[in-house]
Amino acid sequence: VWPLPQTVQMWLEYELLKNPTVPGYFCVSTSYRNEPNPVPGRHNLIFPMFEFEMKGGMDELIEMEQELLIHLGYDASKFIKGKYLDVAKEYGTKELENDHETKLYEEKTPSFFLTDFPEFTSPFWNMKRNDDPTLETANKIDVILSGQETIGSAEREVDRTIMVDRFKAIMNGAYKDKMYELFGEERTMAEMEEFLKFDFIKRSGGGIGVTRLIRSMKLEGLM
């Protein structure tokens, strides 16, 4: 067990950085989520996950996701994109919850692309933030299909210093403290240095909850 690659995402990112001439990598794995307050029909403890890493930033990422959905039969004319803070303001809340995802489905569309997540949602340490620092948002896209977040994706950071600083700061330092507790500071930071040796290219990646995707496709009459 290694400190940083606690999900397949880090391994895929490692492979892409190691072999930058390859357009991207993907795999299907089993994911385990210990949700503190699981909602029946929404949260599964164990589920299949399709994960991918690819070249390109936010524009290329959302283009790929839309092409995937079109290939699966989703209606492109119903695709709607909205920024997190704008949607939260519309629903009179600071933080979007499960009920808001359901409302997006019932009131707007079966295919909503939620973008630009604010810092208080604790975006991961290797997610790129908006080039405008005053916005304090991450280049993150959640694709809400039929009322449930089904694809979680983001553009990756390329600045080494920023990645180290964020690794130590996210969740007010709790993530870093947990890694140190489990694996030790020396081992954790040695692995970080190994990761940071690469020449970082513009890249993105994400995970698709296969169970939720199948659920949505059935609801939309696509399978």
Where does each model-flagged region fall?
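A translation/RNA-centric and nucleic-acid-associated enzymatic feature enriched
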Residues: 1-56, 63, 81-223
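Short amphipathic C-terminal alpha-helix that caps PH/PH-like domains
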Residues: 62-73
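Flexible helix-coil linker/hinge segments at domain or subdomain boundaries
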Residues: 71-82
